């Protein structure tokens, strides 16, 4: 993954002016994965069973180059009233030169696991497993180095065939997830620890051409990072060794964060010409004090996509819905209202092996914020199109 950053510093409260110096960097994340396992099917009580034993290794390495800094023609500050981002002289006075820095940090994860699929009775199946994980983070400057060993995360599930076309299931999964958020003193928060429960019903219709699933879930977690605000609703920053603010937001470990919700999905073919994909989900998340958690995620989302095909041609259109989100508290609270986005698709199949397809996202070029913060906003993607060709060998 590659990422390039260009930054303009924010408004200076002391001078009442904007600093228009410029800074640039780029970074890349390299990932390597290895997963080796052995599957051993066997028969017990005249029913097929399976045991899987394996191990996994993952290394994620962050590399970064700094290009240094400069400032724009006209000085390094401008009066706030005179600043016009649409008419700026963007000539850089001092060339920005690349400063190779190399690897900043790496994260290594190793795990061993064993799992099984068991056919207990004709209508009843079970899945179960356990994973033992090791996690290590190492930075070049030695800051934040930490390691967790022999973390055990089991899971278990039951599937029961209620009728020929219906099955019900329940599942349990334990959660262990290291995180990179820091408290106000600059210490990394402990890993997220928790449990996940889910139950649902799945059905098949029209000879298996149309599938539907309804599920409810509950997730209980501790040590979940929650952003820290002062009594005025202003973001609290991580302090350096001298007690001064850094640019990094501070977090605290919220206990008893509970998320619960419901999901409904329908997908498949209605007949030889029409296809349908529909999904709706709703969840609520609060900490032990009853305060909303993850308020920048829509509590309700829905998507509908209808597809029509006639011989070689096929076309589709859809609508996505995202409920309102917010960030912050009090006077610094920022809201984004409900959001609707339309998409469309058109394709042509030249023969059984060769086809082409045009996808258009955000069909009506809706202007919206995809991410919100107390002092920053992220624009959502404008209307965009992708033309692809597919060939099967």
Residue map of PLM features:
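Structural signature of Gram-negative outer-membrane beta-barrels, strongest in the C-terminal barrel
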Residues: 29-31, 48-60, 101-221, 269-271, ...
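Membrane-embedded beta-barrel scaffold of Gram-negative outer-membrane proteins
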Residues: 1-8, 168, 193-269, 276, ...
């Amino acid at each position: 993954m590659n990422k390039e950053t260009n930054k303009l510093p924010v408004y200076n409260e002391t001078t009442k002016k904007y600093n228009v110096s410029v800074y640039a960097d780029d970074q890349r994340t390299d990932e390597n994965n290895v997963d080796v396992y052995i599957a051993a099917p066997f028969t017990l009580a005249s029913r097929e069973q399976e045991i899987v034993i394996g191990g996994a290794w993952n290394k994620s390495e962050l590399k970064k180059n700094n290009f240094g800094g400069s400032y724009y023609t006209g000085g390094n500050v401008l009066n706030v009233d005179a600043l016009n981002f649409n008419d700026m002289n963007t000539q850089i006075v001092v060339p920005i030169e690349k400063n190779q820095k190399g690897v900043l940090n790496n994260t290594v994860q190793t795990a061993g696991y064993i799992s099984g699929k068991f056919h207990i009775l004709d209508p009843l199946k079970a899945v179960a497993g356990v994973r033992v994980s090791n996690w290590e983070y190492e930075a070049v400057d030695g800051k934040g180095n930490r390691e967790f060993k022999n973390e055990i995360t089991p899971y278990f599930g039951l599937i029961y065939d209620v009728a020929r076309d219906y099955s019900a299931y329940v599942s349990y999964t334990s959660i262990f997830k290291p995180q990179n958020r820091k408290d106000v003193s600059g210490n990394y928060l402990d890993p997220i620890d928790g449990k996940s429960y889910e139950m649902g019903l799945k059905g098949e219709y029209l000879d298996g051409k149309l599938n539907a699933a309804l599920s409810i879930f509950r997730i209980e977690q501790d040590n979940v990072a929650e952003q820290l605000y002062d009594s005025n609703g202003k973001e609290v920053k991580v302090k350096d060794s001298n007690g001064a603010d850094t640019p990094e937001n501070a977090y605290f470990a919220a206990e008893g964060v509970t998320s619960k919700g419901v999901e409904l999905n329908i997908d498949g073919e209605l007949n030889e010409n029409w296809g349908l994909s529909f999904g709706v989900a709703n969840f609520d998340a609060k900490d032990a004090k009853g305060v909303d958690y993850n308020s920048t995620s829509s509590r309700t989302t829905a998507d509908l996509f209808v597809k029509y095909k006639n011989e070689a041609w096929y076309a589709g259109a859809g609508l996505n819905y995202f409920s309102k989100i917010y960030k912050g508290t009090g006077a610094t609270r920022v809201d984004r209202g409900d959001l609707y986005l339309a998409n469309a698709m058109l394709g042509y199949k030249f023969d059984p092996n060769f086809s082409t397809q045009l996808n258009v996202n955000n069909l009506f070029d809706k202007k919206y914020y995809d991410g919100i913060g107390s002092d920053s906003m992220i624009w959502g993607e404008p209307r965009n199109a992708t033309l692809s060709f597919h060939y099967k060998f």
